[in-house]
Amino acid sequence: MADGYFFSFDKLSYVQGKRPAGCILCMVRDRSPDVVDLSVHRDGLFIAAVNLYPYNPGHLMVFPCRHLEDVREYTAEEERHLCALQRWLFGLLDKACSPHGYNVGYNMGAAAGASIEHLHLHMIPRYPRETGIADLIAGRRVLVEDPQETARRLRAIAAQAPFSISST
């Protein structure tokens, strides 16, 4: 392995271009049969989905239904909605994964590490014995849950307490 670089071998084929033509998150939004749909929440403004290449079980990607590429393009309504949705998603993840913390953030642009242009927010559950995100990216930890199973568990919890902007 080259010094100073991290490899995520599961994601290698995706990064090398072995992916469907077009925006993969727009394809998820449109329920294309060409992509895996791991969504756990959908509404008129946002979709929350389990990351197909998670750093940890419960790693979510939250993205606007509109194809945006920069956080500064959000409307005021989208910003308010996203804040309430994040709060609700933290509750789902707390119940499903019992993390001790979270990494939350955006990678905007290829130089920042974004492999998908469509704006998306990462919500990554974290645990006490981890030494950091670098260990996850370097592949030194084993994920103990398939993303499909994570999506199933989160959907079941979401069905018990559906998202409502007024209930957050």
Question: What role is predicted for each listed range?
Answer:
Residues M1-T168:
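HIT superfamily nucleotide-processing domains
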